[in-house]
C-alpha cells in the first residue's frame, strides 16, 4: 500500500477543494493518504482584509516529513506563471532532503489554479516539475486517458501536466465537476504508480 501526501497552499479555497478531490482519488486505490498544507506567510490581519480562506482543516506540514511518503502531490495557485511564494518558501527549505537524496525515486505530481483560462496553468505545473526533477522524483501528470480534459465545449481546466481549475479574477468561479474529476483521476493515477514502484 502506497503512502501519499497531498501538500497544498490555497488562498481562497480553490486549491484546497482540488486537494481533497486528489486525496479522494488516491484513497480509491487503497493508499494511505494524508492532506497537509504549507504555512501562510501573509500576516493574519492582511489576509483577513483580503478575504483569504483561513479556516482550513488540514494541518501544516514539516519539511522533514516529506521523506516519509511514497508519493507527494503538490497543489499551488499560480503567481505570474509560477508557484505561489508560500509553496516556494517551503520548497526552498528542502535542501537537506536533496543532500541526502531523500526524495529520489518517489513519485511527484502537481495541480494548480489560475484566475483565467490562459493564466499560466501549464507554466506553473512545468516549472514546479523542474524542482521535482532536481530531487530525483518520478514526475507524473494527468494523462489523456482522462478524457475530461479534451474538448472545447466549455471553459475548463486540466492539462496533461496536471489537474487544474479556473477561479476567475475575483475567485467567484468554483472548481467544476470535470475539474474535480480530473483531480480525482490524478490522485488515483499517482497512487497506483507509487504502489507499483513500492513493490519493486
UniProtKB/Swiss-Prot annotation:
**Transmembrane residues, as ranges?**
none
EC class name: oxidoreductase
Cite the EC number: 1.6.5.2
Q: Which cofactor does it need?
A: FMN
Q: Listed GO cellular component terms?
A: membrane
User: Which residues does the record give as NAD(+) binding sites?
Assistant: 12
Q: For binding substrate, which residues are annotated in this chain's numbering?
A: 98
Q: Which InterPro entries match?
A: Flavodoxin/NO_synth, Flavoprotein-like_sf, Flavoprotein_WrbA-like, FMN_Rdtase-like_dom, NQO
GO terms of molecular function: flavin adenine dinucleotide binding; FMN binding; NAD binding; NADH:ubiquinone reductase (non-electrogenic) activity; NADP binding; NADPH dehydrogenase (quinone) activity
What positions does the domain Flavodoxin-like occupy?
4-190
Q: Name one Pfam family in it.
A: FMN_red
PROSITE patterns tied to this protein: FLAVODOXIN_LIKE
Keywords recorded for this protein, A-Z: Flavoprotein, FMN, NAD, NADP, Nucleotide-binding, Oxidoreductase
Binding residues annotated for FMN, in chain numbering: 10-15, 78-80, 113-119, 134
The answer, when asked if 4Fe-4S is one of the entry's keywords, is no
Q: Which reaction does it catalyse?
A: a quinone + NADH + H(+) = a quinol + NAD(+); a quinone + NADPH + H(+) = a quinol + NADP(+)
Q: How is the cofactor bound?
A: Binds 1 FMN per monomer.
Task: Return the PANTHER family for the record.
Answer: FLAVODOXIN-RELATED PROTEIN WRBA-RELATED, FLAVOPROTEIN-LIKE PROTEIN YCP4-RELATED
Q: Which family does it belong to?
A: Belongs to the WrbA family.
What's the protein called, per UniProt? NAD(P)H dehydrogenase (quinone)
What is the organism of origin for this protein?
A: Methylobacterium radiotolerans (strain ATCC 27329 / DSM 1819 / JCM 2831 / NBRC 15690 / NCIMB 10815 / 0-1)
Source organism lineage? Bacteria, Pseudomonadati, Pseudomonadota, Alphaproteobacteria, Hyphomicrobiales
Amino acid at each position: 500500500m502506497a503512502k501519499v501526501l497531498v501538500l497544498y497552499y490555497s488562498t481562497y479555497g480553490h486549491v484546497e477543494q482540488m486537494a481533497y478531490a486528489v486525496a479522494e482519488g488516491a484513497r480509491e486505490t487503497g493508499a494511505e493518504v494524508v492532506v497537509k498544507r504549507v504555512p501562510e506567510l501573509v500576516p493574519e490581519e492582511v489576509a483577513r482584509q483580503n478575504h483569504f480562506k483561513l479556516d482550513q482543516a488540514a494541518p501544516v506540514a514539516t519539511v522533514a516529513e516529506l521523506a516519509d511518503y511514497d508519493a507527494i502531490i503538490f497543489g499551488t495557485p499560480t503567481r505570474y506563471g509560477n508557484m505561489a511564494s508560500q509553496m516556494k518558501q517551503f520548497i526552498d527549505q528542502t535542501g537537506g532532503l536533496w543532500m541526502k537524496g531523500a526524495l529520489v525515486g518517489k513519485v511527484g505530481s502537481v495541480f494548480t489554479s489560475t484566475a483565467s483560462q490562459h493564466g499560466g496553468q501549464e507554466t506553473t505545473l512545468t516549472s514546479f516539475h523542474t524542482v521535482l526533477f532536481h530531487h530525483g522524483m518520478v514526475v507524473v501528470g494527468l494523462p489523456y486517458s482522462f478524457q475530461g480534459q479534451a474538448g472545447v465545449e466549455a471553459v475548463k481546466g486540466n492539462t496533461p501536466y496536471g489537474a487544474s481549475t479556473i477561479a476567475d479574477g475575483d475567485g467567484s468561479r468554483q472548481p467544476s465537476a470535470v475539474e474535480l474529476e480530473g483531480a480525482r483521476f490524478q490522485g488515483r493515477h499517482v497512487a497506483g504508480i507509487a504502489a507499483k514502484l513500492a513493490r519493486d
